[in-house]
UniProtKB/Swiss-Prot annotation:
Binding-site residues, (6S)-NADPHX: N80, N81, G82, G83, D84, G153, T154, G155, Q156, S157, R158, P159, D182
Alphabetical UniProt keywords: Isomerase, Metal-binding, NAD, NADP, Nucleotide-binding, Potassium
Superkingdom classification of source: Bacteria
Family statement: Belongs to the NnrE/AIBP family.
GO molecular function, a single term: metal ion binding
Source taxonomy: Bacteria, Pseudomonadati, Planctomycetota, Planctomycetia, Planctomycetales
Residues bound to K(+): N81, D149, T185
Function text: Catalyzes the epimerization of the S- and R-forms of NAD(P)HX, a damaged form of NAD(P)H that is a result of enzymatic or heat-dependent hydration. This is a prerequisite for the S-specific NAD(P)H-hydrate dehydratase to allow the repair of both epimers of NAD(P)HX.
The protein's name in its UniProt record: NAD(P)H-hydrate epimerase
Name of a matching Pfam family: YjeF_N
Record organism: Planctopirus limnophila (strain ATCC 43296 / DSM 3776 / IFAM 1008 / Mu 290) (Planctomyces limnophilus)
Keyword hit for rRNA processing: no
Length: 257
């Protein structure tokens, strides 16, 4: 079932390694688009955000009644995945959704494109809450609410620990539905979902170090980690979204490596 020309449901039955990109290849696609084709990184970010919002507009109707309203809590990291999140928050807000932003880092510490989209979201007056409030907000959320995970995407390079590990566990414990932008936090583009033990006082207890998404909207192509046997448990219903690159040029970018 296709939602629109730019967002399609992933068919797990036909997924092959040849269909997937590694984290390195994903970075090369972005580099090729920006440096070789001259497409602005902000344009790519906007296209990615619009694809996620296309999914929302098809599946999650904005409520016009306070009695039936729900909240979309967008959790944004410091890098480009966070930039996608700020843009998603802005677009959903203009579409009539009730949105709250939680940022893992101060604006001064954000990557340049993320900072641009954070500033735009600020100017629109979208509610911006302190990160320390997220645990309480997630714990008191209703099943109708949504958490948009825009923390790391394909940018994860090592297992989660500390504050990020606690944040992931808080997301998974929430009644909210969860949508992952590109990949759930803790899900490696190359290796799949993460397990580990950041809790030193319980050295023999394995805990989940990966967001359990109900929906994942991944960009350009599936990722190699999606071939992991346990991947679907963390990705949920998975969609592949275009960011505006023709397939022929995409193949050319990957073949250059």
């Amino acid at each position: 079932m296709e939602i629109c020309p730019f967002v399609r449901l992933l068919d797990w039955r036909t997924l092959r390694a040849a269909d997937c990109l590694t984290a390195r290849q994903s970075r090369e696609v972005d580099r090729f688009a920006i440096e070789e084709l001259g497409i602005s990184s902000l344009v790519l970010m906007e296209n990615a955000a619009r694809s996620v919002c296309d999914w929302f507009s098809q599946h999650v109707q904005a409520s016009s009644s306070e009695e039936t309203s729900f909240v979309v809590r967008v959790v944004c990291g410091r890098g480009n995945n966070g930039g996608d999140g700020f843009a998603i928050a802005r677009l959903l807000w203009t579409m009539g959704y009730a949105v709250e932003i939680f940022a893992t880092h101060p604006e001064a510490e954000l990557a340049p494109d993320a900072r641009v989209n954070a500033a735009l979201a600020r100017k629109l007056g979208i509610p911006w809450r302190e990160m320390r409030e997220f645990g309480e907000a997630a714990a008191s959320a209703r099943a109708e609410d949504w958490i948009v995970d825009a923390i790391l995407g394909t940018g994860q390079s090592r297992p989660l620990s500390g504050v990020l590990a606690e944040l992931v566990q808080g997301m998974n414990a929430s009644l909210s539905r969860r949508l992952a932008v590109d990949l759930p936090t803790g899900f490696s583009a190359d290796a799949g979902p993460g397990l580990g033990n950041p809790l030193t006082e319980q050295p023999h207890e394995l805990v989940e170090l990966c967001v359990r998404a109900d929906v994942t909207v991944t960009f350009v192509t599936p990722k190699m980690g999606m071939l992991h046997p346990g991947a679907r448990e963390y990705l949920g219903e998975t969609f592949v979204a275009s960011i505006g690159l023709p397939e022929k040029l995409l193949r050319e970018a990957v073949s250059l490596q």
